[in-house]
Amino acid sequence: MQDLIDSPTAARTPAEEKIRHEGNKLSKRLARETTRAIADYNMIEAGDRVMVCLSGGKDSYALLDILLSLRKRAPFSFDIVAVNLDQKQPGFPPEVLPNYLTSLGVPFHIETQDTYSIVTRVIPEGKTMCSLCSRLRRGILYRVAGELGATKIALGHHRDDILATFFLNLFYGGKAKAMPPKLVSDDGRHTVIRPLAYVPEHDLVAYAKFKQFPIIPCNLCGSQENLKRQEVSRMIQEWDRRHPGRSWNVFNALSRIVPSHLMDRDLFDFAGLKPTGRPDANGDTAFDPIDPEDPREDAGDACASSPADGDAAMAEQKVVFARL
């Protein structure tokens, strides 16, 4: 489809023109949502050197593509360097990413570390390798970031990844914890950002098809198909199919926490709670006949199609990149 982007209008059929039109709309939407996430969490600042971790999957390809586009419009300068970790998985095509990145003219670094052999030696056959593999990969990328002088490490996790992590922690870890758009690395030395935090996965699937990224399969290691994360992801997809808007409601709830109506004593001083004699907007609702399935019950903001829809005025003030 890249040919459709570059070809003159007169040479396109109506069907091709429609594909190009839809692709351009998608590109603008992804750029807009990425810009909002960057602005909301102050992910990128003037003079930053952003290390984009490129795996060869659709998400990291899209992240690099969008950041390169946004950099052209940004009111300040920042550098981008793409980094791939070749873990020596069987069947990994070592030429694909260097050829692609060279064609873009973007600086890149390929780090070769045989973590695959370590994982297969330590983890018994048939057991999940993802956790150990992830820890090894993370440590290597932190080291590379320091060697390259990167001030930000950009990962390609999207909205559905954040939701899946939340439910995994909820179902199997007993804690309300997700995947933050911005955090400090485990070693305390690096800032990790997720600019695609507001982007749903189905948009990235469509974008990869439109841009014809040279996708490298993600299951070269023989990862198991019944992983808990994949099960949770299927649950979220089924929700979207049967109950449109439900996953967005849950996602938006992650940024609308009311500590006084939860049970974490570290977040709210329940022990010291006393009547003040003044009305409280977040006060007692224990006896209110609220039906959470009733759209009339103050659900307007919660049903926004994206995190920015309910706060458009604030977003206009906070966006640091030029409007697209």
UniProtKB/Swiss-Prot annotation:
This is tRNA-cytidine(32) 2-sulfurtransferase. A motif (PP-loop motif) lies at residues 55-60. Homodimer. Its EC number is 2.8.1.-. The keyword Metal-binding applies. The thiolation reaction likely consists of two steps: a first activation step by ATP to form an adenylated intermediate of the target base of tRNA, and a second nucleophilic substitution step of the sulfur (S) atom supplied by the hydrosulfide attached to the Fe-S cluster. Pathway: tRNA modification. It catalyses: cytidine(32) in tRNA + S-sulfanyl-L-cysteinyl-[cysteine desulfurase] + AH2 + ATP = 2-thiocytidine(32) in tRNA + L-cysteinyl-[cysteine desulfurase] + A + AMP + diphosphate + H(+). Its main location: cytoplasm.
